[in-house]
Amino acid sequence: PEQTGSTGAYENVELVTEGEKAKELEAQGKTEKEIAARTEPILGGAELTMLAGQTKAQMMSFLLETKKGGLIVVDGGWWDDADYLKEQIKKRGGHVSAWFLTHAHTDHVGALLNLLQSEADGEDTGITIDHIYYNFASLDWYKKHELGDLGTADAILTALAGLPKGEACPVKKGDEILVDDVCITVLNDRYEPDDDHVGERDGNDASMVYRMLVNGVTILFTGDLQVDGGNHVLETVAKEDLKADIVQMAHHGQHAVTKEF
């Protein structure tokens, strides 16, 4: 799929995990006490990594390693981010316990689509996935509200439909998924505007919101929510449920939800 996303103004930077930071400090000759003071675990032994994009376009890709070694992926990025994503997954054992998708835009599902289509073509990618969780609108909805992303929606829905029974898992508001000691809650119903409303980026507002409870720390993933979708969440989800210690800023931190969110 063609990459047409807006370009980011940031360098290709990847977050450093607590374990990697400890190794770096040890190499610098720091004492155990100094290392402990500068690498206090935020997630109680789990590690969250925000992967850097491999193109100049904005994307979203997160890996969460549980304390017990399970791996959770959120979105994954563009088609051209797939090789780097596969490399990072393999570094963590090559097995994904749960893959969560926020919405069917190429800068979020392209890498997974690349992976699934490669597997369907007979390639051994070296990656195994237990379950993929999603809630996408129908193709008729995309024809009405976001014709420009119809191709991506069609491709990812087709790929998911071709998976073995039980691997592709549609979700709804209130669903809870357990991966080791991590609890993931689906907070919202997908926002669907009235048929007479055709927004500029309705597919962004259709993002699913996932709350992850990781060893007492709450992480909120908001996808690409913008004003209408964000307001829908505020109207239908208890404010207490939206409170979080770590928040993925909606829509790459720009043109997103309101300040009230």
Each model region followed by its residue ranges:
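Conserved long hydrophobic alpha-helices within structured protein cores
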Residues: H103-V109, D181-T185
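Extracytoplasmic/secreted proteins, especially bacterial periplasmic and envelope-associated proteins
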Residues: D80, Y84, G110-N114, A155, ...
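Active-site HxH/HxHxD metal-binding segment of metal-dependent hydrolases
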Residues: A98, H108-G162, E167
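Metallo-beta-lactamase
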Residues: H95-D107, V247-H251
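Long, structured stretches of catalytic cores involved in phosphate-ester chemistry, encompassing
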Residues: V237-F261
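Short, glycine/charged-enriched secondary-structure capping and boundary segments
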Residues: K86-I89, L113-Q117, L147-D149, L234-A238, ...
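Solvent-exposed loop/turn segments at secondary-structure junctions
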Residues: W78-D81, A104-H108, S138-W141, Y191-P193, ...
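Core dinuclear metal-dependent hydrolase active-site scaffold
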Residues: P1-G94, P170-I246
